Design a protein with these regions (language model features):
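Short hydrophobic/aromatic segments of transmembrane alpha-helices and their interfaces
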Residues: 2-3, 33-34, 113-114
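N-terminal capping segment at the start of a domain
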Residues: 27-36
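Glycine-rich flavin
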Residues: 44-55, 59-164
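Intrinsic disorder at enzyme termini
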Residues: 1-16
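Glycine- and acidic
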Residues: 9-10, 35-36, 63
């Protein structure tokens, strides 16, 4: 059987990239794919799949190494997401929100023209959020799909969370 990274054989991938892509393939085939049809049928949140992403370390793939992550870039994330999507679209789509968050508060944030005070505040927040991901297994979401959320952020959120 071919490894998942073989799908990208036309690219020069590092050993680290191959490893994380192949990990996504293995987790996808062995753990995530068997639950995909039920997740689609029930239109439910793939919580067990998130546990598998945490257990495999994929959830921290785009967290910089200095914060305890694997330090992968956007291109690597896209290849991993593609592999996850081959096994469960709901998992790949929802995991995108988490991975995007880790990228936005990482290198993308560093590219902004911020004052020293803003940089210090962002570094503090970034440290907090990366720590939650690495140490607590936190997964982040985004509110882009809320039906009543205005792009400018002027509408209230449409979801109410309840402790279960």
């Amino acid at each position: 059987m071919k490894e998942a990274a073989d799908l990208f054989s036309d690219l020069k991938l590092s050993d680290s990239q191959k490893k994380i892509i192949n990990t996504a393939g293995k987790v996808g085939r062995e753990k995530i794919a068997p639950r995909a049809a039920q997740i689609d049928r029930e239109a439910c949140n793939p919580l067990e799949n998130y546990d598998d992403l945490r257990e495999s370390g994929i959830h921290r793939m785009c967290v910089p190494e200095r914060f305890g992550g694997l330090g992968h870039d956007y291109a690597t994330y896209m290849m991993v997401s593609s592999e996850l999507g081959r096994h469960c679209g709901a998992t790949a789509l929802s995991f995108n929100m988490h991975a995007s968050t880790t990228l936005w508060i990482g290198d993308m944030l560093d590219g902004l023209d911020l004052s020293p005070e803003q940089q210090a505040e962002m570094e503090s927040l970034r440290t907090l959020h990366y720590k939650r991901i690495v140490e607590d297994g936190a997964l982040y979401a985004q509110t882009f799909s809320e039906g009543n959320l205005a792009a400018a952020g002027k509408s209230p959120f449409g979801t109410t969370a309840k402790k279960v």
